[in-house]
Amino acid sequence: MSDFMNRLREDHARLGRAVTAMRAHIQSPERTKRGGWLDLLASLVDYVAEYPDVVHHPREDRLFERLVDQGLTPAERQLVAMNLSEHAKLAEATERLMADVDAVLAGATLSETDLAAHALTYLDLQVEHMRREETQLFPLAERLLSEADFEALDKELDAQRDPLFEQRATRYDDLLEFIAA
């Protein structure tokens, strides 16, 4: 398997761990007693805005754009197009959730219960998006793209590292500790 595909799958595994931990925390009846959940959610959304939305999804877009020229069936073409447009929708959803988190932290009228429901919907979108890529799009790419395509994608793989799991940016220390717990 190519470095490019390995990287995409590794990114999914890492984000999946973060999403799973956050979902469990939000759904816990102890959420508000433990405190700090809003700060953790803010850190997670900030991370998604910084890395998956800005680095990971454009990498996937390059992969999927190569697929378009591979004689796809109409259903496969529709799946690729849907996924490409979904990346933009996920970025918008990230921005909306961050605005809601910021508003609650600033004392706005949005309740923590409503924010928790919004966050769970957002996390579900992320999970479903990654599931579709892992089960449908990545196998399609591996079946249709040539070794030369993957070599070209490997060369395009930029050096930008994951700020949460690789760079260990200090602003994400609490989030990383939370995920590891």
Identify the function of each model-found stretch.
Residues M1-A181:
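Small-residue-biased structural context
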